Structures are given as C-alpha cells and as structure tokens.
Amino acid sequence: ADTNLENEPFSGGRQMSNHFTSDNFDDHGNPLALAHQKNISTDMAPTAAQMPRTIGLALASKLFRNSEALKQFADLSTNGDEVCFCTIGDASTSEGHFWEAINAAGVLQIPLAVFVWDDGYGISVPKEYQTTKGSISAALRGMQKRPDTNGIDIYNVKGWNYAELCEVFEAGIEKIRRTHIPAVFHVEEITQPQGHSTSGSHERYKSPERLEWEREWDCIKHMRNWLIESSI
C-alpha cells in the first residue's frame, strides 16, 4: 500500500488490496473532464463483485446518448460513445452477481464488454464441475442477441492467438460502441505459468499432459513470438 495520494489516489494506502483506480475530481473537488481521459473504476476483492457496478457505468453511457437534458455535460460523455470494459475469471462466472448483471445488460441494451479469462480451472477445480456444459459461452447461448430481440453478443477466441484477439476485440468493441448491444468475450485456453497463485503448485492438480500442453501453448510465449513475427 502506498500512502502517497499521487501514486494511490483512491484510498492513500487504506485499501490494502491496492486496486487501481482513477480520479473523478481534482484536488479542489472540481469534476474532471472524464470524457477526455481513460477511467478506471476500482476493482473489489469479493469474486464477481465488479459485475453490478458495470451495469451502472454502462447504463450511464446509454442515458447520456438518449437524454437531451444530459447533452450539456459534454465533459462527462461524448454522446454516450463510451464502452464499459469488465474482466472476470471463468470460475467467478458461477457467482450470482455475474448472472444478474449479464441478464440486466441484455435487457437494458447497454455498452458493456465483459471479458471472461478461462484457464479451465477455478483455483484447482476443473470448470466442468462448476459450469454448465463446461463452458460459460455455451451456457449463455440462450441470451444470444437475435433479430427483433434483446440479448447479448457472444464471442469465442483463444488466449494464445493474439492476431485473432486483436481482430475480434476491435470489431466487437466497435459494434458495442455503435449499437449499445452488450457482449461477452469468452477467452479460452488461457495459461498460468505458476497456477492460481504462488501459495501452492498447480502440479498437484494438473496432469503431466496438461502441464506439457501449457508449456507448449503458453500465452506469454506466443505473444512474444507474435510481436517478433509482426515486427512490433
């Protein structure tokens, strides 16, 4: 924790998990021009606790787009073109907050992009023991947006395929920003070099075959190769 407000403006070191956040007000209490900066809403430690907040943040953009009374606040929104980005691990999608938020997003039609990082495990528990069909995107298919209905868009992409990630994210976010149709990006085959945490070894619950696969398809290694091959 850092008690320097310039380094940790959210709590001055009082929030010991020290999640990142950005200021909404300057040192004199005046609102900042949020529409002209990237804004981070501080994360929370309880699993899936970020989900309800994302609904409010995304709904704000919809209100700014649709309400003439809010057009005067040009420093807070650019005609509702903002997108709320939310990340969550695949195991946390089993929490009720996740389902309530996704359902609300589908009903409200708000600019929300939810990225599910899926490494196949909830700490040490394989996802087939906690997620229907062993896949959150498969479980959500009934919420897929169809013509003349509300709902969400669902995208599937592999975590080690960075070229495809860029293409899917770019097209998907552009659609969310333009149409305010929310989307879930299910990013599968994520790898963890040291398992869930350094407090225990994933060698205790992953098979030798799985560990060998993770070494071969390590997302960091594949990103490095992609950067070199693309001369980035």
Regions found by a protein language model. Give the residues of each.
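Cofactor-binding active-site loop characterized by glycine-rich and histidine/acidic residues
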Residues: 1-108, 115, 126-143, 149
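Conserved thiamine diphosphate
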Residues: 62, 76-80, 133-171, 215-232
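Structured core elements
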Residues: 87, 113-115, 156, 184-186
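Short acidic, glycine/serine/threonine-rich loops at helix termini
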Residues: 96-100, 124-129, 167, 194-200
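Active-site cavity-forming subdomains of large catalytic enzyme subunits
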Residues: 100, 104, 114-120, 167, ...
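Short, ordered loop/turn segments at secondary-structure junctions
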Residues: 117-120, 159-160, 188-190
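Short beta-alpha connecting loops at secondary-structure transitions
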Residues: 119-127, 150-158, 203-212
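Glycine/aspartate-rich loop-and-adjacent alpha/beta segment that forms the canonical ThDP
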Residues: 175-232
